[in-house]
Every structure is written in structure tokens, then in C-alpha cells.
Amino acid sequence: MTHNHDPYSDAAALKGLTLGQATAYQAEYDASLLQGVPRKLNRDAIQLSGELPFHGTDIWTGYELSWLNAKGKPVVAILEVQLDINSVNLIESKSFKLYLNSFNQTKFDSVEAVQETLSRDLAACAEGEVTVKVIEPKHFNLERIIDLPGTCIDDLDIEVTEYEFNPDHLIGGTDPDKNVAETLNSNLLKSNCLITSQPDWGSVMVRYQGPKIDREKLLRYLISFRQHNEFHEQCVERIFVDLKKYCQCTKLTVYARYTRRGGLDINPYRSDFENPPESNRLARQ
């Protein structure tokens, strides 16, 4: 089994997070509640430095966005945020939830004012580009539930005895005599929160070109995240790097959609050849 030094055990950037701590909920606007985690922590561990081998975005959906209008009447909306992966920080999810809760008893003159506030604060926390969309109730009927594209590999009849993260499952995991372009997906992705070890449930799509990947080996590899502690964004980047390394994909996209917690879901997208699709939720989200 391949072992790596834990990059998080002594990370100063994780010491002050509200995640895993008892916290009071604030109902009035407070941008200081947002907390960022340096992307560099994980990228150093997977030997990513300089120019990244992928582009992409972290797509967040917030289902519990509410504020007061100028007359004090409550307003609700769905929030969609796209955070560029070149930002210095990812946004820690509990702090994001606490920050959104701080809108609940705060008056805003318009939806545009809410959107501008969110854009400014999230960009400042992430130190990067952020796109914010506030979806009003009159547009809720446009929200769709879809399946991830591709062939699902979850019905493979395999025996599993190992649940610790192990990229060695991918060794010898391709047929070099068969070059293909295909899209595979699995609903069996589970990892755990880096700080609290609470389960994170997700579905993942792998679209690639290159030597044909052994689906059984890929499924075993994905299942090996089951006891792995890492943030969503970090897991997806780790999958991308491992597939490029072990499977020699010439083109690759990894896209995961995680179930929501605290009214927020996180959907990291990484690719070296295509752009993110329109964000539509899956049934479990």
C-alpha cells in the first residue's frame, strides 16, 4: 500500500476553524464568519505545484438562503456559487453555513444587493474569482434532477475487504492495447470530513480518453475512500492525479456531486479538456 505523510496533522491553517467546535448561531450579517483553508495543503501532498494539470470550479448550492426585505418581510432563495480552483483558499463549509445564517435577520434592499454582498465576501475569503447566482422562487420550477452521464460501474459483483484509501488498486488498471473514450460513474463514493470525521456521501463521474480502465479496479479504488478523511475538493483532485498517474489518461474529467449538509452541497469539477456543465442536482442531493 502506498503511504503518504499526513499534510494536515500540524497545519496551522486548520487550528482556528469553527468546524468541529460548538458555535453560537448569529442571525445578523457578519462577513467575518467565513473561513478559508489553503488549497496548498492538499496540493503539496499530491505533488501539485506551479501550473495545475487541470482547470475547473467548486460548485456550491445553498438551499437555506434567507434575508429580510426593506420592509422586514422574509425572502428565500437558492444560492449557486462557482469558485475558481485557482483561488488561494477553498471555503470551509461550516463557516459558509454560519455566514449564510447571518443573513436571516438582516435587511437588504434588493436581490442584487444580496448577490453583490455574497460575491464580495466570498471572493475575499477565497482570494480568488467567484461567480454568484441567487435563484428566486419564481425560477424554482427550472431546477432539475438528473443522473450523472455515463455508465454506472456499481453493479460489478466484487468482494470488498479493504476500506482504507489505497491508490495501488489502480496499478495495472488499464489495457494498453485498447484506447477508448468513455464516461463512467459511481454512486459509491464516501469519504469523511477532515476535521470531524462525519461521513460525506457523493457520486462521481470519470470521463477520459486513453488506455481502457479496468472498471473493477476503478471501483475498488473509489471504495477505498470510504474511511479517508479529506475535504470534498481535495478528494476530487486526488482522484484526478491518481488516474493520470496510474491510468495514463490523455484527457480526463473528474466531477463529484456530494449530498448536502447544513443546507449546502459541494460539487468539485476538474478537467484538462472540457468546461463544467450546467449545475443540476442528483436525486440524493
From Swiss-Prot:
Its EC number is 1.7.1.13. Keywords: Cytoplasm, NADP, Oxidoreductase, Queuosine biosynthesis. The keyword Oxidoreductase applies. Pfam families: QueF, QueF_N. The keyword Oxidoreductase applies. It is an enzyme of class 1 (oxidoreductase). Belongs to the GTP cyclohydrolase I family. QueF type 2 subfamily. This is NADPH-dependent 7-cyano-7-deazaguanine reductase. It comes from Shewanella frigidimarina (strain NCIMB 400).
